[in-house]
A protein has these predicted regions:
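Short amphipathic alpha-helix adjacent to the substrate-entry channel of hydrolases
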Residues: 69-71
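Metallocofactor- and cofactor-centric catalytic cores in central/energy metabolism, strongly enriched
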Residues: 1-63, 74-78, 82-156, 166-171, ...
């Protein structure tokens, strides 16, 4: 069975309408339950997938805009914006760990997907060192997908060596069907970034912000040619470029509000009116592959 938990009951009820339809379509045998009660939700839970945005998207926009106003990076994972978001998130994340310790199965695992990943990971390690929690980010896998497109191969054919903390890591070796293709990839990325013809045709890279991100990888490789970077290094190593690129009147948070959030609200309205929706837009995308 799958439980959906949120502290915002109104939002929970609306989101659950979409989730019910997706579950019905993809896994009809799965029993879906909705709750805002901690004890009811977490009792005997085995796996807890956590993704919390403390303060909501409106606070994300504030983090971005206040930071940019002062010439700082406002991105949700790092810089001034990430630090502000992290300070809001650490407390609730520690509370979640304590709730799971109290109610969940003794062998529970929390798979934490909440940003800022590195800050939250360090905080949970420090404050709850024995917690059964895995702090993850899917960006390394997404970069691997770009590599596969560059090499014109399937992602499953790649084997990589990677080190670092969540978003901030480096690929030290990449093999394709057993062949070391690290230098080949370095040469491509140094000239084009993590962009290929296939990437331009990919829905993710049609987004100008993502195209800018993947293209920026070439600058990083030319600065540090030993390894292939996770794209999040741009926020540390290309800070001035990022601040200049970001639009204080059209931040990523605002784009999400006007994009995914708007689509979700429109879908909920249709479901409330008994209409059908295109469920494929709510299937797994770049996040959670």
């Amino acid at each position: 069975e799958l439980w959906l938990y949120d502290i915002d009951q109104e939002r929970q009820e609306k989101v659950s309408l979409i989730v019910k339809e997706v579950v019905k379509d993809l896994r009809p045998s799965l029993e879906l339950k909705i709750s805002t009660d901690e004890e009811e939700t977490f009792t005997d839970a085995d796996f807890i997938m956590a993704q919390m945005r403390v303060g909501g998207l409106k606070m994300r926009v504030k983090d971005e805009q206040i930071s940019l106003k002062h010439g700082c990076i406002g991105q949700e994972t790092c810089g001034a914006g990430g630090m502000a978001y992290g300070m809001r998130t650490i407390g609730p994340m520690i509370h979640l760990i304590d709730v799971c310790e109290k109610y969940a199965s003794k062998t529970y695992w929390i798979v934490n997907y909440s940003n800022p990943a590195a800050i939250v990971a360090k905080a949970t390690q420090t404050l709850r060192p024995n917690a059964r929690i895995l702090n993850i980010c899917d960006m390394p896998v997404e970069v691997e997908a770009r590599m596969a497109e560059i090499l014109d191969t399937d992602l499953s054919n790649l084997e990589v060596d990677y080190f670092g903390l969540n978003h901030y890591g480096w690929f030290t070796k990449v093999q394709c069907n057993g062949e070391d293709v690290t230098e080949k990839l370095k040469k491509h990325v140094a000239e084009y970034g993590y962009v290929s013809k296939a990437s331009y045709e990919d829905a993710l890279v049609k987004d100008p912000d993502w195209l800018h991100t993947f293209t920026n990888a070439k600058k990083i490789v030319n600065y540090f040619p030993d390894y292939l970077p996770n794209t999040y290094w741009q926020y540390y190593l290309l800070g001035d470029d990022i601040v200049d690129y970001m639009d204080i009147n059209n931040t990523r948070g605002m784009q999400v509000i006007h994009g995914r959030e708007t689509k979700s609200r429109e879908a909920v309205t249709k479901l409330e009116n008994g209409e059908k929706i295109d469920l494929t837009q709510f299937y797994v995308g770049v996040h959670g592959k």
